[in-house]
């Protein structure tokens, strides 16, 4: 595949956080998730802009599983929650942090998602499950003339896929 000029390309690192690695085994670990930093850094070399998204959750989130609500069981009554999850990516914890090898200062734009207790978005472009409340990522890319986005990250079945 022929890539356009670098000025039209952005690299988007999606949820490359410890919460999705064996570093945090009680959260949502992805096997070898802590080893992807070199590849994310390599793909960023093709781009003029680098973006990141991070889950940024509260300890009071309504979707956190517990003794009465097992992980992956449905939630009703909240339009921006679908299922229960183990606590993960809690702000101020090791799980919230980027995986080793990623430099927070290297990013031109960051999306923090899931801050509200009654929302658990998966993709990095919208704060809600109906894709109506923008995070600003699409607008940021558009105003910089970006036509191609190279995506990589963790939780490919939810977060990367929905981005």
Q: What do these predicted ranges mean?
A:
Residues 4-10:
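Extreme N-terminal starter segment of soluble prokaryotic enzymes
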Residues 10-12, 150:
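Conserved beta-strand elements of the Class I
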Residues 12-14, 54:
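Active-site flanking residues adjacent to catalytic metal/cofactor-binding acidic residues
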Residues 16-23:
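Short acidic, Gly/Ser-rich segments with clustered Asp/Glu that frequently serve as metal-coordination loops
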Residues 18, 55-57, 115, 155-158:
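Short, glycine/serine-rich, charged loops/turns that create anion-binding
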Residues 24-32, 124-128:
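Short glycine-enriched, charge-decorated loop/helix-capping segments at active-site entrances
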Residues 38-148:
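Active-site alpha/beta core segments
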Residues 146-162:
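Glycine-rich anion-binding loop/nest that anchors nucleotide
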């Amino acid at each position: 595949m022929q890539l356009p000029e670098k000025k039209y390309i952005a690299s988007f690192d999606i949820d490359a956080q410890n919460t999705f690695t064996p570093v945090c085994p009680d959260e949502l670990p992805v096997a070898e998730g802590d080893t992807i930093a070199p590849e994310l850094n390599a793909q960023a070399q093709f781009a003029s802009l680098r973006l990141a998204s991070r889950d940024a959750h509260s300890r009071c989130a309504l979707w956190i599983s517990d003794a009465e609500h097992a992980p992956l069981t449905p939630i009703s009554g909240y339009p921006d929650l679908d299922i229960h999850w183990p606590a993960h990516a809690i702000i101020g914890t090791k799980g919230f942090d980027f995986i080793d090898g990623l430099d927070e200062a290297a990013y031109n734009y960051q999306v923090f998602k899931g801050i509200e207790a009654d929302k658990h978005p998966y993709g990095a472009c919208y704060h809600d499950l109906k894709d109506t409340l923008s995070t600003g990522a699409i607008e940021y890319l558009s105003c910089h003339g970006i036509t191609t986005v190279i995506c990589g990250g963790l939780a490919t079945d939810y977060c990367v896929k929905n981005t």
